[in-house]
């Protein structure tokens, strides 16, 4: 998963930390992908509907109405728990969390405070080290509990309007341990989880539509003084609705905490919100005003009891998981680098596109997996992203990409000409193969040794000083001479043959090949 390139993370910067270290935990609310709500038959659609059309009497809390559990939501939560390696609790229960808000008509939220459906999972993130390598880190997940969403309040200058379309929508609250130590790690975790949920089909992960929301808990401790990592006072930032705002909110909090502590002040336990325009967090309430939710088991709902057979049946519906796919791509026989493997994984259909190219029987020789992956991840995806087109709608087919790689491997075209060819494929959408385009434009690579020899002779004759320097051991001029030969061939001479033949002719020494 890729980080926000436009945002410079500061929570790993020692000049900012001043001996302190951050401790971060996340609470992520993911709307379960289900056609109907958690305890009613209403549709879960709320973004494209008129207000208050997907509301049953129970959703609106009419007296005498009772909840009826949607079993499919339990199945989806179990699937999520298994995907993160969690323990599926065969016994769980629903509890009431009491608080008043206009868009919560029941006066309480139905959640799983005491006995959640899932406990003790983990999710791996891969942290870039700045040198092209990645360091894996496992973030523990304390619990996944199933609960209902609230409605939506719309405010203007004079009124607050209530839309209950979202009220009762099924949520998974995914709570991590405080294992994260930077805003970068938090961003990586959320994006990895977002992709995982989409991949297994349990949440669409659309933060901009509110189906994935994040609360962050941030504290710092004085590592240079040997303080315990959990000795700091945490503050919670609620309802961050953009993956790119998560590191911004965290870094602001880290700086705020450190500034207070270095000035001799104490951190107050607070609940805050993030103002994306200002790039800062704002106080919502302090510890003294934290409500007592008066949790107790919901008397209208039975315990949720599962069997081992039920859990096993859910397990069979889980596709290959992202980490397993990356492991496959970075191992024999593919041996891709981590970056290219992730590009293929995170672009829908990318792995299938890659493997279809490699396994097609039309190629005269085996294609290099690394070269195929690079042409998809760098060249094709670069064109697609610039035009905001997905891989599934690519005007360049897998056969055309394969034809480019085959032509490069056979030295029929150069890498430079191949980039021109894929641009023509992309723009003209003609379906032509690489060699056809190369022939039409005079871009076939020159591999005739006699022709290349004549080009080398001409450059040697035109640059006697440089050739003399080369013969006297000044190797730095050799690449200059190579470039002149390539230029003379209009970019079509085989670089490997130019290197070999030019060196033989310029130094009067035959090159040896293994």
Curated annotation (Swiss-Prot):
Entries under NCBIfam families matching the protein: gatB, PRK05477.1-2, PRK05477.1-4
Keyword vocabulary terms for this entry: ATP-binding, Ligase, Mitochondrion, Nucleotide-binding, Protein biosynthesis
EC number: 6.3.5.-
Location in the cell: Mitochondrion
PANTHER family (alphabetical): GLUTAMYL-TRNA GLN AMIDOTRANSFERASE SUBUNIT B MITOCHONDRIAL AND PROKARYOTIC PET112-RELATED, GLUTAMYL-TRNA(GLN) AMIDOTRANSFERASE SUBUNIT B, MITOCHONDRIAL
GO terms of molecular function: ATP binding; glutaminyl-tRNA synthase (glutamine-hydrolyzing) activity
Further details from the record: This protein may be expected to contain an N-terminal transit peptide but none has been predicted.
Main location: mitochondrion
Protein name: Glutamyl-tRNA(Gln) amidotransferase subunit B, mitochondrial
SMART domains according to UniProt: GatB_Yqey
């Amino acid at each position: 998963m890729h980080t926000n390139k436009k945002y410079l993370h500061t929570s790993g910067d020692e000049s900012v930390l001043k001996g302190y270290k951050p401790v971060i935990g996340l609470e992520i609310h993911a709307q379960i992908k289900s056609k109907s709500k958690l305890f009613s038959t209403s549709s879960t659609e709320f973004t494209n509907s008129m207000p208050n059309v997907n509301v049953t009497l129970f959703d609106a809390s009419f007296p005498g109405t009772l909840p009826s559990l949607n079993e499919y939501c339990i199945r989806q939560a179990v699937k999520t728990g298994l995907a993160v390696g969690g323990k599926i609790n065969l016994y769980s229960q629903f509890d009431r969390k009491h608080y008043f808000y206009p868009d919560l008509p029941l006066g309480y939220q139905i959640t799983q405070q005491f006995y959640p459906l899932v406990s003790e999972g983990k999710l791996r993130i891969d942290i870039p080290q700045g040198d092209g390598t990645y360091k894996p880190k496992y973030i523990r997940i304390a619990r996944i509990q199933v609960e209902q969403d609230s409605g939506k309040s719309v405010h203007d200058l004079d009124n607050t309007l209530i839309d209950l379309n979202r009220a009762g929508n099924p949520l998974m609250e995914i709570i991590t341990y405080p294992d994260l130590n930077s805003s970068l790690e938090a961003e990586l975790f959320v994006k990895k989880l977002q992709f995982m949920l989409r991949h297994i089909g349990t949440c669409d992960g659309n933060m901009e539509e509110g189906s994935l929301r994040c609360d962050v808990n941030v504290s710092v401790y004085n590592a240079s003084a040997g303080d315990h990592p959990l000795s700091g006072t945490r503050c919670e930032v609620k309802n961050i609705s953009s993956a790119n705002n998560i590191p911004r909110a965290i870094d602001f909090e880290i700086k705020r905490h450190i500034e207070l502590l270095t000035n001799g002040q104490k951190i107050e336990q607070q609940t805050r919100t993030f103002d994306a325009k200002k790039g800062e967090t704002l106080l919502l309430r302090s510890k003294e005003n934290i409500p007592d939710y008066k949790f107790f088991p919901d008397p209208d709902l039975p315990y949720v009891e599962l069997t081992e057979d039920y859990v096993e049946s859910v397990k069979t519906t889980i596709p290959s998981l992202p980490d397993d796919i990356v492991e496959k791509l970075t191992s024999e026989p593919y041996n891709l680098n981590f970056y290219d493997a992730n590009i293929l994984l995170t672009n829908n259909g990318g792995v299938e596109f890659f493997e279809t190219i490699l396994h097609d029987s039309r190629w005269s020789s085996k294609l290099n997996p690394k070269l195929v992956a690079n042409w998809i991840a760098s060249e094709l995806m670069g064109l697609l992203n610039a035009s905001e087109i997905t891989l599934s709608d690519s005007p360049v087919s897998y056969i055309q990409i394969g034809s480019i790689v085959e032509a490069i491997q056979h030295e029929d075209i150069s890498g430079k000409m191949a980039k021109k060819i894929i641009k023509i494929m992309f723009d003209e959408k003609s379906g032509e193969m690489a060699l056809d385009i190369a022939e039409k434009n005079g871009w076939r690579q020159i591999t005739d040794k006699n022709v290349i020899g004549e080009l080398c002779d001409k450059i040697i004759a035109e640059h006697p000083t440089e050739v003399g320097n080369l013969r006297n051991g000044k190797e730095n001029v050799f690449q200059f001479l190579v470039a002149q030969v390539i230029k003379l061939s209009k970019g079509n001479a085989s670089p490997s043959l130019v290197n070999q033949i030019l060196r033989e002719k310029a130094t009067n020494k035959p090159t040896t090949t293994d």
